[in-house]
Amino acid sequence: MIKFFLMVNKQGQTRLSKYYEHVEINKRTLLETEVIKSCLSRSNEQCSFIEYKDFKLIYRQYAALFIVVGVNDTENEMAIYEFIHNFVEVLDDYFSRVSELDIMFNLDKVHIILDEMVLNGCIVETNRARILAPLLILDKMSDS
């Protein structure tokens, strides 16, 4: 099960955070700081899976952005690693080569995409067309 999903830039600034288990606000800040430090300090040659406290971190870097997913011990690391790539491909489809600015200025749409893909910490959809369908309908409604 996915515990949290983070998008972070190289400077360590959180661009998106989504928690699927309750974590108090003051503990979230500490958790994010430690997780970000753990991922940013690693070299490209090191594995993208990290054992951290009572869960695993799986991360991928795309240009200046890192996507970090915290999961429980029973989750398949490779499945989450590919899920991260699928998420970025969906963002690329919607934004036509997504950038950090797209995420910052369209955070609501990024949350909709993530909510279409993950429900209560479980991956429920990976088909790009089905994931983007609600957003395309919203875009049509706002255009008219």
UniProtKB/Swiss-Prot annotation:
Function in brief: Component of the adaptor protein complex 4 (AP-4). Adaptor protein complexes are vesicle coat components involved both in vesicle formation and cargo selection. They control the vesicular transport of proteins in different trafficking pathways. AP-4 forms a non clathrin-associated coat on vesicles departing the trans-Golgi network (TGN) and may be involved in the targeting of proteins from the trans-Golgi network (TGN) to the endosomal-lysosomal system.
Keyword Chloroplast applies: no
Xref: Gene3D superfamilies: 3.30.450.60
GO CC terms of this entry: AP-4 adaptor complex; Golgi apparatus; intracellular membrane-bounded organelle
Name this polypeptide is given: AP-4 complex subunit sigma-1
Family per similarity comment: Belongs to the adaptor complexes small subunit family.
Subcellular location: Golgi apparatus, trans-Golgi network membrane
UniProt KW Transcription keyword: no
Organism (species): Bos taurus
Membrane topology: Peripheral membrane protein
Taxonomic lineage from the root: Eukaryota, Metazoa, Chordata, Craniata, Vertebrata
PANTHER family named in the record: ADAPTOR COMPLEXES SMALL SUBUNIT FAMILY (PTHR11753)
